[in-house]
Curated annotation (Swiss-Prot):
It comes from Stenotrophomonas maltophilia (strain K279a). Transmembrane segments: none annotated. It holds the Pfam family DUF493. This is UPF0250 protein Smlt4048. Belongs to the UPF0250 family. Signal peptide: none annotated. InterPro entries: UPF0250_YbeD-like, YbeD-like_sf.
Length: 92
C-alpha cells in the first residue's frame, strides 16, 4: 500500500494505491466478483495485487484488493461498492 505524507497528521494522500479487504461466504466466487465490481464502478484495480484466503473452516473467504484512487471520493466509492454487495459481511 502506498500512502505518502510528509506530515502524519494529513491522513491519506491522493493520488495513491490503497488496499481493501472484504469478507463473505467462500462459495460465492467473491474472489473474482469483487474486483470486477470495482472495475465496473470505474476504480483502477491492480490485478497482480489481488489475493484471497479461506478461513480455517472453509466457510468464509477474505479478498484483498489493491486499487488506485485519484481522490478521496474515488476511495470512498471503492469502499461503498464493496459494502453494497449483498454477500459481503465485513470490509477493512
Amino acid at each position: 500500500m502506498e500512502i505518502k505524507s510528509d506530515n502524519p497528521d494529513h491522513g491519506f494522500q491522493f493520488p495513491g494505491q490503497f488496499e481493501l479487504s472484504a469478507m463473505g461466504p467462500a462459495n460465492r466466487g467473491l474472489e473474482h466478483e469483487l474486483p470486477r465490481l470495482l472495475l465496473a464502478a470505474g476504480i483502477d484495480v491492480v490485478n497482480e495485487r489481488i489475493s484471497w484466503k479461506h478461513s480455517s473452516n472453509g466457510k468464509y473467504v477474505s479478498v484483498r484488493i489493491v486499487f488506485k484512487a485519484e481522490s478521496r471520493e474515488q476511495y470512498d466509492l471503492a469502499h461503498q461498492a464493496l459494502r453494497d454487495h449483498p454477500e459481503v459481511k465485513w470490509t477493512l
